Amino acid sequence: ASLVGNYILNMQQMLVQGQQNNSQMIDHMINSEYGGYIACVAQWGNAGNFYTYDPRIGWVGYPFDTMMPQIFTPFIMLKDLTNGEGPVYAWAQILKVYGAYLLNGMYGPIAYTKVDGENMAVEYDSEEVLFNAMFADLDEGITNLTSTVLSGEDMSSLATFDYVYNADFTK
């Protein structure tokens, strides 16, 4: 469970960036501003900010370059380890969808359906294809995780790898 659990931990860390620069760049300055979740009330720094839609060149791709591997690398490893089955894979599907949703909010279309273990630099999906694929993955993940919960399967071995609910998936 520890190898599988570590991949789940890696995916959860993508949800809320713990490292200071990542948190500032991804969660606050870029995701919040570009995604339209917040607006800056006072000018910060000098020219080249996201709230003026004129970011510094070095900042533009930071979330993408950071989050794509955080989402897809552990997901692909988990898919291989679980043969694309079971509650851990279902959990990973849900986390992958959330990460892709965040990236889409910042950048629009992203690569999703064609990303595999060989290459992340693949053709981008249109937003229609992206959202249809994300909803399909989300539905499958929720259905499989719900089946696991309803069956009463013991998931306590994953508790140390769940930052939020300690593997109590009834929550």
Model feature map: region roles:
Residues A42-K171:
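Structured, solvent-exposed acidic/aromatic patches
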Residues A1-G36:
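Acidic, glycine-rich segments characteristic of secretory precursors and extracytoplasmic regions
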Residues Y37-V41:
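Membrane-embedded catalytic interface detector for glycan/lipid assembly enzymes
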